[in-house]
Structure formats: C-alpha cells, structure tokens
Amino acid sequence: MKRLRVTLAQLNPTLGDFEGNLKKAIEALRVAEDRGSDLLVFPELFLPGYPPEDLMLRLSFLRENRKYLQKFAQHTRNLGVTVLMGFIDSDEDAYNAAAVVKDGEILGVYRKISLPNYGVFDERRYFKPGEELLVVKIGNIKVGVTICEDIWNPVEPSASLSLGEGVHLIANLSASPYHVGKPVLRKDYLSMKAYDYHVAMAYCNMVGGQDELVFDGGSMVVDASGEVINYGKLFEEEIITVDLDLDENLRVSLVDPRRRYMKTQNYPVKTVEAGNLREKSGHFEPVVNPLPVREEEMFRALITGLRDYVRKNGFEKVVIGLSGGMDSSLVAVIATEALGKENVKGVLMPSMYTSKESIEDAQTLAKNLGIETFIIPITDVFHSYLETLKGVFAGREPDITEENLQARIRGNYLMALSNKFGWLVLTTGNKSEMATGYATLYGDMAGGFAVIKDVYKTDVYRIGRWYNSWRGKEIIPENIFVKPPTAELRPGQTDQEKLPPYEVLDEILRLYIEEGLDPEEIASKGFDRKTVLDVTEMIRKNEYKRKQAAIGVKISTRAFGKDWRMPITNRFKEPL
C-alpha cells in the first residue's frame, strides 16, 4: 500500500515579519513531526509573506528571506518529515519558489512556472518564471511540487507532472485571495483537476489579511477520483494532517483511460530523493468542514481583513462615527466581532438635522454591542463655519457645500480622537456609494480603513439580517433596517433623491464593474437606458474620490483597489 501522511500548515504570516513567521513555521514543524508526517506543506511565500510587492526591489529584504530559510532548515535536523517551504529564490534573478527541506538541508528548489499578471496580481513585475519541474521522491511515492497559479493553469504544469512524470500527488503551496464564492469555486476546480489527471492533490492555502486582500484558507486534500477527502476551516489557522491512500490513483486510471491519450510539454525535470516513508501508528481521520452561506462567508472575510489590518499595523482600538444608519451599524458589528467590544469606540455627532430616532437607534446598537460611546454635537461648530464664510458666500443659496461642511466637521472630530488616543478611524461607506461618489471627500471618507467599501448596499442589509439571525436576537435594531437610508444633512433628505433604488443600482453596478458589460448590454436586461448611462457617468466622474479613499477589504471579483486601475483624467463616456 502507498500511504502518505501529509500535513498542511494553513497559517497566517505577517509580511516582512521573518522572526514571527519563522516561529509559526517551527511550531507547525513540531506538530507535523509529532504526528509522524511524511510531508509538511506551507503556503506560498510563507517566510517573507505575500504579496511582498516593491519590497522585492530591496536587496536587504531578499537577503533576510534567504537567511531565515537557512534558520528554518536548521530546525529540521534529525527530523523525519520532508518540508515544502515557500520563499523567494534570488540567486541570478528573483523567483517565487518552494524549498524542499529535510534534516537540516535544502535538497532542492522549485521555481513557480505560471506567474499571474491580472486582477490583484503583478507577479511578472517582480519574478522570473521557472522553467523546470520538481519531483520529490519519498520512498516509492512521487510528489510533484507546484505553487498557486500553476494549478489554475488549465494544462501545465499539472499535465506534465501527472502524465509525463507519473507523480502520485501534486502538492500546491498557495496564497489565493478570497472573493465571494471563491471557496466553492476552488473546491470544485481542484476536484475536477484531480479527476481529469488521476492524481491526488494536497493544497495548502494561506489564511489572514494583508492590506486589502484576505486569504481564506480552505486547504484541502483531494484523492485521484476527485473526492475532497479533507477540507480545512475557512478564515482560521489550522494544521491539517491526512493519511492519503495513493493506490487509488492506479484504480482510477484503469477504469478511466483518458490520460493515456493526453499530450504534455517537454519540461526538464529535477528529481529529489527525500528518503523513505516513515513507520506510522494510528490513523488520521479526514474532516470535511462545511461551506458557510454567502452572508456568513462575506462577514467572516470582513472580520479577518479588519482584525489583521488593525493588529498587524500595531493598533489596539478603533473609532466609528455612529449615525444610526445601516452602514455604520454593520461596521460597528464587524469591529466588535473582530476586536472585542472593549476595543471599539462609537461617536454620535448629531446636527440640527439629526432625528431623535437616529440618535436612539445608534445608542441602542451601541448598548446591544456593549461598546463605549461619546456624543459630540456639531451644530455650534457648523454655525461658526457659516458665520465665518457668510461674507464670501453672500448672494448664494445653500447647496451641497453646506452638506459637505457637516460631513467634514465630523471627519475632523474623528481624526482628532484618532490623533489624541491612537484609535484607528473606520470609515463606513459602502461600494454603492464609492462607485457613484455618494460620499464626501475629507468628510465621511476620512479615516484609516474602509471595512465595507467593497460591499454593495443591498448586501449590507443582507449581512445585517443574517447577523441578527445568527446571534438569535436583535443586535441591529429593526428600525435601522426599515427606515429609508439618509445622510441627514438637510431636512427630509433620502439617498434615493440622487440615486436609483439600491436594488436597481447595485445590479447595474455589478454588471458594469464585475461583469464588464457595456451600457447597451445592461439596458438589454431590462434596465432603463438613461438610468444606466447616469450610473456609468457617475462612476467615471468620481474616480478622483476613489483614488483618495482609505483602503478596505476586497470581497468581490473586482474591487476599487488593486484590481481597478482607471485614470482620473478621462473624457471617454460610455455610448448607448
């Protein structure tokens, strides 16, 4: 029987924290050794962290990365486990690489062949692609080494490893960023890939937040029939160990002979001998964790992104302007779940236009969450501004200027608290507002992290409803769900005076931003032509605001951040 004990170290590194990442790696190494593992797989670029971006241009960063790989190798002395460790190989150029480490030695290095250069990825800016396959032999078992995008490539190098080299297992070191629906997409894809090539797969994904990116984990082991026999937790660190029966590969190939007729490329191959299989005791039962519903998935991604941004950047507490509306309520909920109620501060900043209802809703929410609040009215300061500007504004009617003044006063208050106490200001704008420019630059956009900037308004409501249901009680007051959304910057104001109903707006935005449809195609789906053009024009005209917005968690297939690179100076208008 060909039985391989595989351990996947689904861990949360911090970019540039070589010492901290090494400590995590050593802890995982000890666990794998105690469990009698034959193979231990880490995520992509685990030692330096991912994505390193322009740190790749610093020789000192590359040298530290190499130094800590050697340090890690020393900790494998006299151990029986073979390790695949993600690092940067930078001898004659820079490569996204995996080192094969055992018993104090680096036995070989694999260099990533398929470098993604789309969406949030810029790997061709920093890395040279590898040109050689790497096969690790552990006893009579052959393991092919790949890194992230290598297995997303439809054919190679998976085909050459499985068909050409006859590997029993493809190990994949991954740092695959999250978007809504990505866990099930990834699970189905790897299942299909294993089935098509009749090869088992051990996929180790990173977990945690890095600036706007979230890595969701979901590491898995798939057998040669395409069955996911172990599926890790989402958004949590976990060390997974699986006993993998690799005799299944031959059984599947005999029943389904398609692979005999598949063609492969002629990559050069390096084979590394990593000793014998280990004597094993006991058996590690596989665990397939269930996938969460859509709202829970998004909620946990937002928690992960916020928690890690706060902690990894040295903050302890955050502050939020509480308006009594849905957006600030959801941000407060996410912050409380991510950081604990003692680390979240709420500020109510009422004006003469703020309703009693809004104040009560904000106070009820804060009480339900158990967070401390402060009330700092803006009315006197607002009147002082108007008095100061009276001469300059003489002869002009009140307009959006006076509305934006209120938002900017509130932004000043929050930033003053941030400066005085070291609290990180969380902005509360959603994707619908960021797309259309329905936000005030240096006002409600002022802050350090925009938690829900990639969440459409309709999804803000859905996540809020799910949260109350999950908690089994009304944390977010019902009145916040049912009252018309409003900025309360003048009497009787509602969002729908300037925007289409959010159910309409969000679908137009999704089709235009994420699906890339033209206005004509969107209108053909039943939307009013003028409304579609108005929305796309708002998107174009407000690029300057988005360029100055705080970063926030990416949860969609295309967010306003690393994967949205529109010019500000732009006279192109969508035709219809």
Curated annotation (Swiss-Prot):
One GO biological process term: NAD biosynthetic process
Keywords of the record: ATP-binding, Ligase, NAD, Nucleotide-binding
Binding site for deamido-NAD(+): N404, E433, K545
Entry's Gene Ontology cellular component terms: cytoplasm
Enzyme class: ligase
InterPro entries associated with the record: C-N_Hydrolase, C-N_Hydrolase_sf, Gln-dep_NAD_synthase, NAD/GMP_synthase, NAD_synthase, Nitrilase/CN_hydratase_CS, Rossmann-like_a/b/a_fold
Cysteines engaged in disulfide bonds, as pairs: none
Pathway this chain belongs to: Cofactor biosynthesis; NAD(+) biosynthesis; NAD(+) from deamido-NAD(+) (L-Gln route): step 1/1
EC number(s) reported in the record: 6.3.5.1
Pfam families membership: CN_hydrolase (PF00795), NAD_synthase (PF02540)
Catalysis performed (reactions): deamido-NAD(+) + L-glutamine + ATP + H2O = L-glutamate + AMP + diphosphate + NAD(+) + H(+)
GO terms for MF: ATP binding; glutaminase activity; NAD+ synthase (glutamine-hydrolyzing) activity; NAD+ synthase activity; nitrilase activity
Family: In the C-terminal section; belongs to the NAD synthetase family.
Role noted for this protein: Catalyzes the ATP-dependent amidation of deamido-NAD to form NAD. Uses L-glutamine as a nitrogen source.
Protein name listed in UniProt: Glutamine-dependent NAD(+) synthetase
Species whose genome carries this gene: Thermotoga maritima (strain ATCC 43589 / DSM 3109 / JCM 10099 / NBRC 100826 / MSB8)
Gene (name only): nadE2
